[in-house]
A protein has these predicted regions:
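A short, Lys/Arg-rich alpha-helix, primarily the initiator
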Residues: 1-20
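Residues within the helices of the helix-turn-helix
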Residues: 12, 23, 53
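Short, charged recognition helix plus adjacent turn
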Residues: 13, 38, 64-80
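The alpha-helix within a helix-turn-helix
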Residues: 15, 26, 56
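Short alpha-helical DNA-recognition segment
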Residues: 19-38
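The DNA-recognition helices of helix-turn-helix-type DNA-binding domains
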Residues: 32, 43, 70-74
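Short, basic-rich loop-to-helix N-cap that marks the start of a DNA-contacting helix
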Residues: 43-57
């Protein structure tokens, strides 16, 4: 799995888990809804760490919690 796919899937999972809409996350994180949608729909394949931190803050989790999943632990190497 590619890193951007893992980020997208994790974000979708957290939105469902926290029962948040894109609009709610945008308000809580101060990240524009268009930016969140670009990540979710694959237009943005390299969201910045600051953006991810803001999204995590909006969901009430840490960056460590965001990345601490089996999916991220087993990501394939991007550069071969």
């Amino acid at each position: 799995m590619k890193t951007y796919t893992a980020v997208r899937e994790r974000l979708l999972c957290l939105l469902e888990e926290k029962r948040m809409s894109v609009h709610q996350l945008a308000i809580e994180s101060a990240v524009p809804p268009s930016t969140i949608k670009n990540i979710l729909y694959g237009k943005s394949k390299n969201p910045g760490i600051v953006t991810l931190k803001m999204l995590c803050d909006g969901m009430g989790i840490t960056l460590t919690e965001f990345f601490q999943t089996d999916t991220f632990r087993t990501l394939e190497q991007e550069i071969k």
